[in-house]
């Protein structure tokens, strides 16, 4: 019989398939989060060298704050971030936020300026690849994909005429939207936000006095000129022209000053003769335009000046207010020219310039009148179909951009600082000038509340999916179109959800949820990056005259639009593209056969178009897209197993995913391993504590194991310890199992899976899950609660696992109902039952005043207690407790000093080695002389580098010593901070929630072996539920006697069109036989002929089929079966978490029916359709029982319980409580409904 060691596959070599074109180095997969948050904080930059970005930008925008009278101003100088008060572990255990204090330096300008530091709250610290610890839980802020600020031109269907009319929207980063539409009467109208429509020329008049008159507006859009006329003979010169300005009778004429032709009107033959005969010498005119939009708009515009236009727009925006010119001017100024209220933003200005061909500086953030003129000109060109103007595709990634955490956090903090500004101005007006200080003016709660809301409760702040390393990495790279300022899933249409050609290399076309969020939640492609404007870009190799250059360029979607892009697997010879019928290139959304000279760019890798999860699916190109979507989503649900194993058939991405995941440990610096065990690793002066059996967000288990031994040399960034679901630094989500695609007595009907008992016996798919429970002690009105072993009315047997303080002992195996922590609460005197009163009268008053409030193991949980932790506030201590506390404090101080002394002496020795000088302090005592640790720690605290460098005369050696100090001093600082933090923490006690005096946390490890009902899946979307576990002897076996481990239904392949699983099976079989791991990158992997060659080399049939023998009968199977090794995952949908049965439990107060759901220990709903089923069978008594005594007949429940106790089989059904609710509802409608009971 096969044993674990025989069936565990250990490949001895690696075979890489494909052309090897995907050698382009992968970028840092977590950069989307880490780089943007670093840009937001700018913590490494000097306070006076910070860019106007992120937090710095918000502070510069809000400050200075001036008082209402202008006499006092509060100026911002700089900000600094302190050190965190708590460790990561403390924050997890005590449900705190892991952050660092934000302090800003402010100057209050009055008669005597005051500079002061003000604390504004804690800013969360980013861990790993983008997680924050907020209130004890790890969260991530998902990046938002939204419609970019700028100008968009679209065609909209007119419902009455069926014409497609162009419209334009000017969308700012902050402020009012302006929408310009072409009406069915061929005029231009404008809407500001949701205001009523008015003529577009009215807005232009209001924006700038230089566009006050019709002549000014016509001159802005068309070529105009002055035509000289002299008598009637020149009448033809101005005939059929358009008058740009009013033509009036000249002075000296009997009708002097009267208008002959108004501006914007056509000069007819009759009018031209009148003008010439009247003695007019010159006419401002223009040719009749092809598109009459402006003329039609001027005809609709009943304003004639700048002031009149302002008043009309004011009436539209404030319909109820009386029109006043100054108020109208102020409103218009605030709406479009005030930086605080209207801001196009850097991106908006960039897009305006790009679309309209403007060359305006990007620092100009407001909308200029010339911008609106240019936008309307473009709209006129769109109306003229022959002009070549193009409408915008709003789903194109050139028009959608990414808002990363720096922008999202800045926006939320800005709201908090605006509240702060109002508060400061109010306080300035009521406080006496002499008593004012920055601290007395600032209320930090408005800022800290904004920080707490954004990171803790914001729509884009989500609890990290930590099922396995891939799920965490994928969550950090997720893009959402939902959230504040984004789309609504109910109103989002098909177009915005669909895959777009501009997604190529930027957004994964495969990875997206299957439900209502499909297409709205997406994932970043492997090589994609974000540029300074927030647009997604992807790398390409530059091709010049058919030759591939070494230059790599990162292009936005709009930059790529007009170029031919060759795929990565294009045939190349001597660095040049090979012409021929196979020379294809992508141009926009089409592939064309082209000449090499036409190609401008080339993909950097075949896997460029997909995301991380899809990049892990071997033979992805042979799978249907729907199944690939399921495969990439289900890999994120794979549970980390007890014994990990990388896939025999991989894509080469497995190592990259593990390396970029926060679950493994990577070396911060190169060096030599000085210490390594299961709990910590030391490389020189760097210390790496390892996490042991730590529960993650999804209750999966993180247990880090070292990969190196003492004496090994490691490089910077090398993986030195494995985490959950990794092996030797490679992602290992499942196990390689021997599969047979065959039906088996119908047990694998409808995708059900049959597995061998061998997988259960050998713990192949066993996983560990960590559950944590906590219980708190509070001060109640009746007295204080207490942890104790002395619990009333509880047997000694139930207390056997508790220690003297009432806490369960580590290592105890617990089951549902077992006591984890003994706790008693004060009990009100009125709560005593008559029986208790009698007992207290007989046995005295002991135990009378407390009730049992212990923490018990809930149903469905069974396992071993792996850790218990007790936290308490530092309260008044007794004499013995105080002495014990002082001893512990002294011990921690000694340990801290020893750690500081060790790191400091290591630094000094390395500096002495680099300089060749014995370094001394100011008294002449050697710095590293192995003295008392306390003395050395004090010396380290007061250490000054310049005093030491003065002792080194040689310039080069001084620089070498300084370099050693730069690399190692932070370890000394870290040791000092750790000692001080630990001592301060002990002195002040644990930071528990308000009202909590003590808290105990219990961690239970549950071992889950694979069982019937568990969900399993491959990487190709081939999922199923285990229907049967067969004994090993009943499983079909190969000719050499090896039993099959898992049987899948062959009908699951053709209709699902995921043939990749069959290719994986064949190559996996060859790999297992020959002892190699196959790396077959997507779109550039092993071909069919290469797989056949591998099978032949292994001595296996070329078609991958073999005749199996039935283990039950010993007879050979009738047909040959496809057999091989496939990588199968156990998913997080475990049957143990879902199976639930109710005996007695809570009832709904109103209907008196049992509650629903496992969490509430609810019942199974017997619904309408189930009632029909019993009615169809005529099972009247069963139905009566289900709808009354088993549900909400309160009296009937009591009676049937009594009859069961007496052993009688009687059923007396009464009226269901829900029926009483119905009758009361009807009576509430003033209908007198009465029940009449008749004997049956």
From Swiss-Prot:
Q: Does the keyword Nucleotidyltransferase apply?
A: yes
GO BP, one example? Answer: DNA-templated transcription
Print the keywords alphabetically. DNA-directed RNA polymerase, Nucleotidyltransferase, Transcription, Transferase
Q: Which InterPro entries match?
A: DNA-dir_RNA_pol_bsu_ext_1_sf (IPR042107), DNA-dir_RNA_pol_bsu_external_1 (IPR019462), DNA-dir_RNA_pol_su2 (IPR015712), DNA-dir_RNAP_su2_dom (IPR007120), DNA-dir_RNAP_su2_hyb_sf (IPR037033), RNA_pol_bsu_bac (IPR010243), RNA_pol_bsu_CS (IPR007121), RNA_pol_bsu_protrusion (IPR007644)
Task: Work out whether the entry's keyword set contains Transferase.
Answer: yes
Enzyme nomenclature, EC number: 2.7.7.6
- So what family is this one in? Belongs to the RNA polymerase beta chain family.
How the protein assembles, per its UniProt entry? Answer: The RNAP catalytic core consists of 2 alpha, 1 beta, 1 beta' and 1 omega subunit. When a sigma factor is associated with the core the holoenzyme is formed, which can initiate transcription.
The record's annotation in PANTHER family points to: DNA-DIRECTED RNA POLYMERASE I SUBUNIT 2 (PTHR20856)
Which protein are we looking at? Answer: DNA-directed RNA polymerase subunit beta
Which lineage is the organism of this entry classified under, starting from the top rank? Bacteria, Pseudomonadati, Planctomycetota, Planctomycetia, Pirellulales
């Amino acid at each position: 019989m096969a044993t674990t060691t025989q069936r565990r596959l250990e490949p001895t070599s690696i075979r890489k398939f494909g052309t090897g074109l995907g050698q382009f180095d992968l970028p840092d997969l977590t950069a989307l989060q880490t780089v943007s948050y670093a840009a937001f904080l700018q913590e490494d930059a000097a306070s006076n060298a910070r860019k106007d970005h992120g937090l710095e930008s918000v502070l510069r925008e809000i400050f200075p704050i001036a008082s209402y009278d202008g006499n006092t101003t509060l100026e911002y100088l700089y900000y600094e971030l302190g050190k965190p008060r708590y460790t990561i572990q403390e924050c997890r255990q005590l449900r705190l936020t892991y952050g660092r204090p934000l302090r800003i330096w402010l100057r209050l300008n009055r008669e005597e300026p005051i500079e002061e530091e003000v604390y504004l709250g804690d800013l969360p610290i980013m861990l790993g690849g983008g997680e924050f610890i907020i209130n004890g839980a790890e969260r991530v802020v998902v990046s938002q994909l939204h419609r970019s600020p700028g100008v968009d031109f679209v065609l909209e269907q007119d419902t009455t005429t069926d014409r497609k009319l162009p419209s334009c929207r000017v969308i700012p980063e902050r402020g009012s939207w302006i929408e310009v539409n072409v009406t069915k009467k061929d005029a231009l109208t404008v809407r500001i936000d949701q205001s009523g429509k008015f003529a577009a020329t009215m807005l232009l008049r209001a924006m700038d006095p230089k566009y006050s008159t019709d002549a000014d507006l016509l001159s802005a859009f068309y070529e105009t000129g002055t035509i000289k006329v002299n008598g009637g003979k020149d009448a033809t010169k101005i005939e059929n022209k358009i008058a740009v300005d009013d033509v009036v009778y000249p002075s000296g004429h009997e009708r002097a000053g009267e208008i002959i032709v108004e501006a914007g009107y056509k000069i007819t033959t009759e009018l031209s003769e009148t003008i010439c005969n009247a003695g007019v010498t010159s006419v401002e005119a223009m040719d009749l335009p092809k598109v009459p939009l402006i003329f039609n708009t001027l005809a609709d515009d009943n304003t004639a000046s700048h002031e009149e236009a302002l008043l009309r727009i004011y009436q539209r925006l404030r319909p109820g207010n009386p029109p006043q010119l100054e108020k109208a001017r102020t409103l218009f100024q605030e709406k479009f020219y005030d930086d605080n209220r209207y801001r196009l933003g850097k991106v908006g200005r960039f897009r305006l310039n790009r679309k309209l061909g403007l060359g305006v500086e990007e620092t100009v953030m407001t909308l200029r009148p010339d911008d609106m003129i240019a936008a309307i000109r473009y709209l006129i060109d769109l109306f003229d179909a022959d002009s070549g103007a193009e409408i915008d595709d709003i789903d194109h990634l050139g028009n959608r951009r990414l808002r990363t955490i720096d922008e999202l956090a800045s926006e939320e903090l800005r709201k908090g600082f605006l509240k702060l500004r109002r508060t400061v101005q109010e306080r300035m007006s009521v406080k006496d000038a002499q008593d004012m200080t920055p601290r007395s003016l600032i209320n930090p709660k408005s800022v800290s509340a904004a920080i707490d809301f954004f990171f803790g409760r914001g729509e884009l702040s989500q609890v990290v999916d930590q099922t396995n390393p891939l799920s965490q990495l994928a969550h950090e790279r997720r893009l959402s179109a939902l959230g504040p300022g984004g789309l609504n899933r109910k109103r989002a249409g098909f177009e915005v959800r669909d895959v777009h050609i501009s997604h190529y290399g930027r957004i994964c076309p495969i990875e997206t949820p299957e439900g209502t969020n499909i297409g709205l939640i997406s994932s970043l492609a492997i090589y994609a990056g974000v540029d300074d404007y927030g647009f997604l870009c992807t790398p390409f190799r530059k091709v010049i005259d058919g030759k591939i250059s070494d230059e790599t360029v990162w292009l936005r979607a709009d930059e790529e639009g007009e170029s031919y892009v060759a795929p990565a697997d294009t045939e190349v010879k001597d660095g040049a593209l090979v012409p021929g019928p196979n020379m294809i290139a992508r141009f926009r959304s089409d592939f064309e056969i082209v000449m090499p000279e036409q190609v401008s760019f080339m993909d950097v890798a075949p896997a460029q178009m997909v995301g991380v999860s899809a990049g892990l699916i071997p033979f992805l190109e042979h799978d249907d897209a729907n199944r690939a979507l399921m495969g990439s989503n289900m890999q994120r649900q794979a549970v980390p197993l007890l014994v990990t194993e990388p896939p025999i058939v991989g894509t080469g991405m497995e190592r990259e995913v593990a390396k970029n995941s926060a679950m493994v440990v990577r070396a911060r610096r190169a060096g030599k391993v000085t210490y390594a065990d299961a709990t910590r690793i030391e490389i020189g002066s760097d210390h790496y504590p390892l996490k042991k059996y730590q529960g993650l967000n999804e209750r999966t288990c993180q247990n880090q194991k070292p990969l190196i031994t003492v004496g090994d040399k490691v490089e910077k960034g090398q993986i030195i310890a494995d985490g959950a679901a990794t092996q030797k630094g490679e992602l290992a989500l499942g196990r390689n199992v021997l599969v047979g695609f065959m039906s088996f007595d119908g047990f694998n009907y409808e995708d059900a899976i049959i597995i061998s008992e061998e997988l259960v016996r050998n713990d192949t798919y066993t996983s560990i899950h960590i559950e944590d429970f906590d219980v708190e002690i509070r001060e109640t009105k009746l007295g204080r609660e207490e942890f104790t072993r002395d619990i009333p009315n509880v047997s000694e047997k139930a207390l056997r696992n508790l220690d003297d303080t009432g806490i369960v002992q580590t290592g105890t195996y617990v089951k549902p109902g077992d006591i984890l922590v003994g706790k008693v609460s004060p009990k009100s005197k009125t709560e005593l039952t008559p029986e208790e009163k009698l007992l207290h009268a007989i046995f005295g008053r002991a135990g009378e005043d407390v009730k049992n409030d212990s923490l018990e193991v809930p149903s469905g949980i069974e396992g071993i207690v792996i850790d218990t932790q007790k936290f308490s506030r530092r309260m008044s201590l007794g004499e013995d407790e105080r002495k014990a506390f002082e001893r512990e404090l002294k011990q921690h101080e000694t340990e801290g000093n020893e750690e500081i002394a060790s790191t400091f002496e290591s630094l000094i020795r390395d500096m002495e080695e680099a300089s060749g000088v014995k370094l001394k302090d100011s008294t002449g005592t050697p710095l590293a002389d192995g003295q008392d640790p306390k003395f050395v720690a004090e010396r380290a605290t007061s250490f000054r580098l310049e005093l030491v460098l003065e002792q080194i005369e040689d310039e080069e050696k001084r620089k070498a010593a300084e370099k050693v100090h730069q690399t190692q001093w932070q370890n000394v600082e870290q040791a000092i901070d750790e000692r001080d933090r630990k001592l301060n923490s002990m002195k002040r006690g644990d930071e528990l929630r308000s009202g909590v005096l003590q808290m105990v946390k219990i961690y239970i490890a549950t071992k889950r072996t694979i069982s019937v009902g568990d969900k399993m899946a491959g990487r190709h979307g081939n999922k199923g539920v285990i229907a049967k576990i067969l004994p090993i002897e009943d499983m079909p076996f190969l000719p050499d006697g090896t039993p099959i481990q898992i049987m899948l239904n062959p009908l699951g392949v053709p209709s699902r069109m995921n043939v990749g699983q069959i290719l994986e099976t064949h190559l996996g079989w060859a790999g297992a036989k020959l002892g190699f791991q196959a790396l077959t990158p997507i779109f550039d992997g092993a071909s069919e002929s290469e797989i056949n060659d591998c099978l032949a080399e292994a001595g296996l049939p070329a078609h991958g089929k073999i005749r199996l023998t039935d283990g039950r009968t010993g007879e050979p199977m009738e047909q040959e079966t496809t057999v091989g090794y496939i990588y199968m995952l156990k998913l997080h949908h475990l049957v143990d978490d879902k199976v639930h049965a109710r005996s007695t439990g809570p009832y709904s107060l109103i209907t008196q029916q049992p509650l629903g759901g496992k969490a509430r220990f609810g019942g199974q709903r017997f619904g309408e359709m189930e009632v029909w089923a019993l009615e169809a069978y005529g099972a009247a008594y069963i139905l009566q029982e289900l709808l009354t005594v088993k549900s909400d007949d309160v009296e009937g429940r009591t009676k049937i319980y009594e009859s069961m106790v007496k052993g009688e089989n009687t059923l007396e059904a009464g009226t269901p409580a829900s029926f009483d609710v119905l009758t009361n509802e009807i009576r509430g409608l003033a209908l007198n409904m009465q029940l009449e009971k008749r004997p049956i």
